[in-house]
């Protein structure tokens, strides 16, 4: 590949470390959980919006529901495109400015309100949620709110609020989760007054219809330029920008996701967000809050799955009674309902913590994204199984033969991307693990440095002993061993005691892993993934219990029902946690790695005999690209034309 950038593992790691937020200026519930502490006071009482904010949100949702009643999701699915009038309606409601401050023409709504909007629009069609989320969570508004200048906010935020759609351009044909390989460049020109962008960006959600782009590109280091991956706001109709492809996917049939070529695109220096070299840090910081949109979207679909499962399992009769009364199906319904309660709790808690700003939520947001994506996919799969052949059949086909057009197979297809979007589950586990072991890495020093010599490791060991001499004894005994602890939670107190005990057990096991593998721990991705999954389940149990207690306090009748749901969820989650603890040290990780290496070396190719692979000869695994002008037609189009006065017009 002509533009492939070669980097070593060490260079890639260094860039990742340089780009992450290293300080912890605010408390973090999840960080403490991984360290063996259970600071319940950080999440209890369950935070909630003010009465005024709640009333404002409800009023907006009423208007949104009225509009969505006129939107037909099947039209989007069949056409694989969102009709212009649907986008116009969302813009007129202010949906593109939900999180933009009112001084820039936005609605200045909370993260909680924003997520409730995403839940609702997603249940009409997931592409609507993707459109709004990509625009506001990772598009131009969020990076500018975090790192933009006053002038940048004045120039661009009113347009975004009015419906000028934005997109985020980071991924490249050969660059996914490893941005150190980024090949797109931003070369200073005009005596430093501008930059010239060159490159190709892949999977540009909203990129086909965007007015504004956030583009990540590498600035060469030179005199007067610190260089590095940098972020720019770019007008999508700038000369040299070509949308060469509109991609098609398994799900999200209406998503406007493409391939964008940039050739000699001139960008004024005033459009640089932050400093040169800050682009990746800005992107990661943006994602800390931006990731909360995906749990909301996943939860919206899971709620829809619960409704379908309930109604169908009463209606469908087999062997003399409704299928929902058969234990095999009842267990699935229980899982769907209990998991829905926890999904709701995790989304609400994380979002309200983001709104309050009292806590560092980088781990909570990442856990919410990881756990919600995984669990919602399981919910969708169980629903499909409950529906049987009708679950596998399309809504259009069901309707054609006179049955209710239930889009279960579409829901499953649409949910699947959440385990890949904005950090795959595998990458999320590694990112969270890095934060979870941060205190250990700080204490260990050169013990965790693969390049350190024996003298350096010996010195580091002496320093680490002080930290662990104070920390380890605190993991022996805790409040979770006292039978009366958390008794204000009634029947749920036992689950909070389980979380407290498990938190200390998790911390001890993390330490054992550090002691056993030291600098090699980062390569033990199976172990680290299980550590993170345990933390995610403990976070979800905590959120469910605290939310149930808040509901009981506010409304005893609803609270009793919430307790029932939370009880079922906690018991299910406890079984998963115990299995994960067992798997930390009893697993097939080593044999899996050995077998995978043998597979990659071609040892078992005889297993592949007797098949036809019709993809052979259709193209390379990864498309190459060369810098230069595009030879393709520009597929860019606009939903809306937003004037300088920020009025949205077709």
UniProtKB/Swiss-Prot annotation:
GO cellular component terms attached to this protein's record: cytoplasm; cytosol; peptidoglycan-based cell wall; plasma membrane
SUPFAM superfamilies associated with the record: Acyl-CoA dehydrogenase C-terminal domain-like, Acyl-CoA dehydrogenase NM domain-like
Enzyme class: oxidoreductase
Region named Disordered: 1-23
Pfam families attached to this UniProt entry: Acyl-CoA_dh_1, Acyl-CoA_dh_M, Acyl-CoA_dh_N
Keyword Hydrolase: no
Biased composition (Basic and acidic residues): 10-23
Any one GO biological process: fatty acid beta-oxidation using acyl-CoA dehydrogenase
GO molecular function: acyl-CoA dehydrogenase activity; flavin adenine dinucleotide binding
Active site: 422 (proton acceptor)
Keywords linked to the UniProt accession: FAD, Flavoprotein, Oxidoreductase
Reaction catalysis annotation: a 2,3-saturated acyl-CoA + A = a 2,3-dehydroacyl-CoA + AH2
Family affiliation: Belongs to the acyl-CoA dehydrogenase family.
Protein name (database record): Probable acyl-CoA dehydrogenase FadE10
GN (gene name): fadE10
């Amino acid at each position: 590949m002509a533009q492939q950038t070669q980097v070593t593992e060490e260079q890639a790691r260094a860039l990742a470390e340089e780009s992450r937020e290293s300080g912890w200026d605010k408390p973090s519930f999840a960080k403490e959980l991984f360290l063996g502490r259970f600071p319940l006071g950080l999440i209890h009482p369950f935070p909630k919006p003010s009465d005024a904010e709640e009333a404002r949100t409800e009023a907006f949702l009423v208007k949104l529901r009225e509009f969505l009643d006129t939107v037909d999701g099947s039209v989007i699915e069949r056409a694989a495109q969102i009709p212009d009038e649907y986008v116009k309606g969302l813009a007129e409601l202010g949906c593109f400015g939900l999180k933009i401050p009112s001084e820039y023409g936005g609605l200045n709504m909370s993260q909680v309100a924003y997520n409730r909007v995403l839940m609702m629009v997603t249940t009409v069609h997931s592409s609507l949620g993707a459109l709004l989320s990509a625009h506001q969570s990772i598009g131009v508004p969020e990076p500018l709110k975090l790192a933009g200048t006053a002038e940048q906010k004045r120039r661009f935020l009113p347009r975004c609020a009015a419906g000028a759609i934005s997109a985020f351009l980071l991924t490249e044909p050969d660059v996914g989760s490893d941005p150190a390989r980024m090949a797109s460049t931003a070369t200073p020109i005009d005596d430093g007054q501008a930059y010239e962008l060159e490159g190709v960006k892949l999977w540009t959600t909203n990129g086909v219809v965007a007015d504004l782009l956030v583009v990540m590109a590498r600035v060469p280091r030179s005199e007067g330029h610190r260089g590095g991956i940098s972020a720019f706001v770019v007008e999508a109709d700038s000369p040299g920008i070509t949308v060469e492809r509109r991609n098609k996917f398994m799900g999200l049939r209406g998503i406007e996701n493409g391939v964008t070529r940039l050739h000699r695109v001139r960008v004024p220096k005033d459009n640089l967000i932050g400093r040169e070299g800050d682009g990746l840090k800005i992107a990661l910081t943006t994602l800390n809050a931006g990731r909360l949109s995906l749990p909301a979207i996943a939860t919206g679909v899971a709620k829809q799955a619960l409704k379908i499962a309930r109604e169908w399992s009463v209606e469908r009769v087999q062997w003399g009674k409704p299928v929902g009364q058969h234990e095999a199906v009842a267990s699935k319904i229980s899982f769907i309902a209990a998991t829905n309660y926890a999904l709701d709790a995790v989304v609400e808690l994380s979002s309200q913590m983001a709104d309050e700003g009292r806590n560092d939520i980088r781990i909570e947001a990442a856990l919410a994204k990881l756990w919600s994506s995984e669990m919602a996919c399981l919910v969708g799969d169980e629903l499909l199984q409950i529906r049987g052949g009708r679950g596998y059949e399309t809504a259009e086909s069901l309707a054609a033969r006179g049955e209710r057009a239930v889009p279960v197979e579409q829901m499953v297809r649409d949910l699947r991307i959440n385990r890949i979007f904005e950090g795959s589950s595998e990458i999320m586990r590694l990112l969270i693990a890095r934060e979870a072991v941060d205190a250990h890495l700080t204490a260990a020093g050169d013990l965790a440095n693969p390049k350190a010599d024996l003298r350096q490791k010996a010195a580091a060991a002496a320093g680490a002993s002080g930290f662990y001499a104070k920390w380890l004894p605190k993991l022996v005994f805790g409040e979770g061993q006292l039978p009366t602890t958390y008794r204000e939670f009634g029947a749920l107190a036992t689950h909070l005691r389980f979380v407290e005990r498990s938190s200390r057990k998790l911390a001890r096991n993390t330490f054992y892993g550090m002691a056993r593998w030291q600098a090699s721990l980062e390569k033990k991705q199976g172990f680290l993934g299980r550590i993170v999954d345990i933390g995610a389940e403990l976070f979800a149990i905590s959120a469910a219990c605290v939310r149930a207690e808040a509901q009981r306090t506010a409304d005893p009748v609803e609270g009793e029902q919430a307790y029932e749901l939370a009880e079922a969820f906690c018991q299910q989650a406890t079984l998963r946690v115990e299995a994960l603890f067992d798997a930390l040290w009893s697993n097939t990780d080593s044999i899996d790695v050995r077998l995978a290496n043998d597979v990659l070396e071609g040892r078992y190719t005889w297993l592949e005999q007797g098949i036809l692979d019709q993809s052979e000869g259709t193209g390379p695994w990864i498309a190459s690209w060369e810098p230069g002008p595009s030879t393709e037609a520009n597929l860019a189009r606009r939903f809306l034309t937003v004037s300088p006065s920020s009025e949205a017009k077709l």
